[in-house]
Regions:
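C-terminal motif of bacterial Sec signal peptides marking the signal peptidase cleavage site
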Residues: 5-8
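Short, solvent-exposed recognition patches
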Residues: 37, 41-131, 135-136
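N-terminal "mature-domain start" segment
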Residues: 10-68, 159-178
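Second-shell loop/turn segments in exported
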Residues: 22-27, 75-81, 149-158
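A short, solvent-exposed beta-edge/loop patch
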Residues: 111-178
Length: 178
């Protein structure tokens, strides 16, 4: 009986460290700090590609690559840099909305900014034993605008993406309460 009581009084799954970090990190957070490519590199982030920013209004640099949060499985990120937080919000929000979530535009013919579109999508097969052809889904469930960066972070939904963005921001020394 005592053992049952111990487990029954255990941790609430809603009180995970991930959901606690979500309480601090907001999807849009102003910061006076201007982040650079070097800030990202200092975390152990592995840049796979640097995209041409032509057509991505206001952006100065875009990285695509992966990072391993706390030694876990590598997750993919697309990090867009802007001259300031205001420019990131004003010029980059619509592009980030278009590239993330269930309503992401993943067809090159329809996307506003086509560079790297293949890296923003997952292909999945139909169920085993069926003749289903599968489909395409957005790799990035959501994004964070933090200072002069827009980070698209791998995740099944916006909450997963926010957690992963938060982990990389913390590794960069960013303070969500600044």
């Amino acid at each position: 009986m005592l053992l049952f009581t111990f487990f029954a009084c255990g941790t609430d799954p809603d009180e995970s460290s991930a959901s606690k970090s979500n309480e601090l990190l907001q999807p849009v957070t102003p910061s006076e700090r201007l982040f650079t490519h070097e800030d990202v590199d200092g975390t152990g982030f592995k840049t796979a590609k640097e995209y041409d920013v032509e057509g991505l209004t206001g952006a100065t640099d875009v990285l695509f690559g992966f990072w391993r949060p706390d030694g876990s499985e590598a997750k993919e990120y697309e990090i867009r840099f802007y001259p300031s937080h205001d420019v990131a919000v004003e010029s980059g929000t619509a592009f980030a909305d278009e590239a993330t979530g269930d309503d992401a535009i993943l067809d090159k013919d329809e996307a506003t900014w086509k560079e790297g579109i293949k890296d923003r999508r997952y292909f999945f097969a139909g169920p085993i034993g069926t003749h289903g052809s599968g489909g395409v889904k957005a790799k990035y469930g959501g994004y964070v605008i933090y200072g002069n960066m827009i980070m698209l972070c791998e995740g099944a939904n916006a909450a997963h993406s926010l957690d992963r963005c938060g982990a990389l921001l913390a590794a960069m020394g960013a303070d969500p309460l600044e």
